[in-house]
Amino acid sequence: MTVGDPRGIGPEIVAKALADPQVGERCDIAVVGPEGAGISVDESVGRWVPSSDAALAGRLSGLAIERAVEMALAGAVDGIVTAPIDKAALHAGGYDFPGHTEMLGSLTRSRVAMMLASDKLRVVLATTHIPLSRVIEALTTESIVEAARITRDGLRDWFGIAEPRIALCALNPHGGDSGRFGNEDTELLAPAASAAGIAGPFPADTIFVRALRGEFDAVIAPYHDVGMTAIKVASFGSAVNITLGLPFPRTSPDHGTALDIAGQDRADPSSMIAATLLCSSFALRARQPGGRQGYGDRPTESRSAARPSRAQ
């Protein structure tokens, strides 16, 4: 379990998760982070003043992620739960990644996808942390087919769904309305969905309602905010971020660093606890006879942590 950005609420929600009875019963946890984060459930850490050095915080966040991945690839731990990081601080600290998902994919040389999941809804993002102006160029038949493959494998391996029902959310209003509002849905998304063997594309204003009613096991959203809005409206505070495609389970809470309330004992640990318990359930599933440690038969060298790209 990484503490995330030590200036934020990460250390607090980690400490609260460690103190949770369910977590204590189900998990043995190694905390990875700077000693100064003061994680303790047995004694007071006394008075402290959070650092304002964003670059240092980002550097420490990145080092913790690197170390956690090394431990997971070596088999020292069964999975990783990550507390929130500050993306700008991560970059200032020398790590040229938009966030956890991309960094984890690079470190493990894996093709990954971001899933947000709750007991009501599962959403996978076909594109993640890019400007809206770049979404159309980033969406390709290959990227959608790959997102569907990773989603299908994740639903089978981690959630135990033998025949996953996956749908693709449309890009344009009303799915383009026969080309009146754009041709991408008919010319790109529909052929890609057919090639991937998934349903859709269906308009965003109905697809998530259908998924909430149980028609689909997961929805692939074409861009970040349409998917994030749906999951957070449905399950704010209880959803879990999952990186699909890694050779080990990785989860995190569905919120950010909340720098404005750090150190005030106001942080709600619910999502962190949910992330920890879900990671534990994935790890237990992988240990069962026939369980899989990850997603496919990648070469042996892909199991060794790669050195991440650094910002200049």
Per-range role (PLM):
Residues 103, 114, 123-125, 248-250:
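Conserved hydrophobic/aromatic beta-strand scaffold that supports enzyme active sites
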Residues 116-146:
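Ligand-binding beta-strand-loop-alpha-helix segment within the catalytic cores
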Residues 104-105, 115-116, 158:
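Short secondary-structure boundary/capping segments
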Residues 1-100, 138, 142-222, 226-251, ...:
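Contiguous, glycine/small-aliphatic-enriched amphipathic segments in soluble metabolic enzymes
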Residues 101-110:
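A glycine-rich helix N-cap at a beta->alpha junction
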